[in-house]
Amino acid sequence: MNKPKTKTCLVILSILLMCSGQVLAQQQGREKYEFTRNLPVYADSLIADLTYPLAWGHSDIRDFDAWKRAAREKVFDCMFTPPPAPANGFEAKVLYEEQREGYKARKLEIRLSRYYTVPAYLLIPDGKGPFPAVNVLHDHGAHLFIGKEKVIRPLACEDSVVIKDAEAWVQNYEGQYFGDYLARNGFVVFSTDAPMWGERGQKEGPRRDRYDMIAGNMMMYGIDLSAYMTYDDIRATDYLASLPEVDSKRIGCTGWSMGAYRTWMLSALSDRIKAGAAVCWMVTTDEQLTLHYSRTENGGFANCLPGLRRWLDYPHIASIACPKPMLFINGSKDKLFPVAGEQNAFAIMHDVWESQGAGDNLETELWDMPHSCPLRAQERVLAFFQRFL
């Protein structure tokens, strides 16, 4: 038998079976159902039962510092067991270095856990430090092939496929690498791959449809993939603070989309962070998980911390960062986040900052833009950090 022809026939047969299965599934719809558009039909009843009893103003804790400790403890509790700390520190290795215009770029490998090492990019301005620093947190975008390379221009040591992919993705930032922009303006910049992105992805390739399956399997170990992302961001910031080129009292974080989610989570949970700027990720669960809108960002496993919603909503978690300076920019044309949810979240946070006499430290802005991180947003973030770091 001709083996190449046999292999081709098997591939064709597999495709036909897959397609027929999809068609059959579409034809097998039942008259009665309980789920639609990835949500239960009783979604609004679930939302009505959410009272967020640990939120500031809902909780019976009246001392703000005591509330922050209790709220932070609850978040960590819902994040499950953290990855075990490395036994011998970060064991950082410089894999490659190149000089850029006004700053050096390094590729590193650092140990964030006894389980694993993590690749990272580090940009250091020329001149005498120490400098203020920013942990730039990459986005999701349903694009897992690259991570840190979305926000820092890939070094020359990277494969040409990675470089080409990053050059295409940076158009979401209007062609400017966010991290390089900050480095040119005097900031040390650091960025790592989140779990499942870039060099922390799957051997079989960056298949988005496998993300949820892997996240579910992680839960079977009693751990949480989204939580690991946040735990890593906290430890990566600890590493950043340890560098001699960095002024450890002037560290901020920023990101777009999932990077924005990572930003306010990190700002809330790490005392290392002195200021945070989040672009296009803030909403309330009431508007995020309802069937009232044709399309919303349900989040999925990328921001799933089991049980936490029974205690705190997104803006309540972000408010643990109070009274730190925080900037939130959302888009009025962002199809992922309903405007009502953005505005309600902003109002909740303003109430918290105002209650602590720190109203001037919280800046929330709703721009006439879609889900994007344009040059003017990056300029706004730079001005914010120049003011507060």
What are the residue ranges of the model-derived segments?
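Short beta-strand/loop motif that positions the catalytic acidic residue
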Residues: 321, 328-330
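Alpha/beta-hydrolase fold nucleophile elbow
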Residues: 245-257
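Cap/lid segment of the alpha/beta-hydrolase catalytic domain
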Residues: 129, 136-231, 241-242, 287-290
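N-terminal pre-domain segments of enzymes
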Residues: 26-77
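Bacterial Sec-dependent N-terminal signal peptides
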Residues: 1-31
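C-terminal catalytic histidine-bearing segment of alpha/beta-hydrolase fold enzymes
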Residues: 301, 347-389
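Mobile cap/lid helix-loop segments that gate and shape the active-site cleft of serine hydrolases
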Residues: 213, 217-220, 235, 275-318, ...
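N-terminal cap/lid segment of alpha/beta-hydrolase-fold proteins
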Residues: 77-129, 133-135
